């Protein structure tokens, strides 16, 4: 059985990027440019349904009906602003703590850096 955690009211990070802090420090401009491109793609995804479904259908190799269903489901749960939330990271850590014992004592906030999302929000990429 496949469950949609957001549909069950369970906080879950639906989108976002994971980058080591050391990489971010030395390659911040690359990460910012990548996130700008991601923001542009997200805008197309949310604002141009037909174009998005056509592209997804082509590259996923699924029927249009299946692709549209997946599109509609993801759109319900995905945030237009990919700002990570402490609650969603906490849920992830809870989910992996059995196989990753360090997760049980990890501080969810230590995994979050919103500086790039904040910058792109000021630039108008996210609302």
Which positions does each model-derived feature cover?
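Ligand-binding "clamshell"
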Residues: 1-6
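Residue-level "edge-of-site" marker
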Residues: 7, 70, 109
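A bilobed periplasmic-binding-protein/Venus flytrap-type ligand-binding module shared by bacterial periplasmic
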Residues: 13-29
């Amino acid at each position: 059985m496949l469950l949609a955690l957001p549909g069950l009211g369970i906080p879950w990070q639906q989108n976002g990027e994971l980058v080591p802090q050391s990489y971010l420090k030395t390659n911040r401009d690359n990460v910012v440019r990548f996130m700008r491109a991601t923001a542009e793609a997200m805008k197309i995804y949310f604002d141009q349904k037909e174009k998005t479904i056509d592209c997804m259908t082509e590259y996923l190799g699924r029927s249009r009906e299946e692709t549209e269903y997946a599109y509609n489901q993801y759109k319900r749960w995905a945030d237009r602003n990919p700002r990570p939330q402490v609650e969603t990271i906490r849920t992830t850590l809870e989910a992996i703590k059995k196989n990753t014992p360090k997760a049980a004592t990890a501080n969810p906030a230590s995994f979050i850096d919103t500086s790039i999302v904040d910058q792109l929000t000021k630039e108008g990429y996210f609302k």
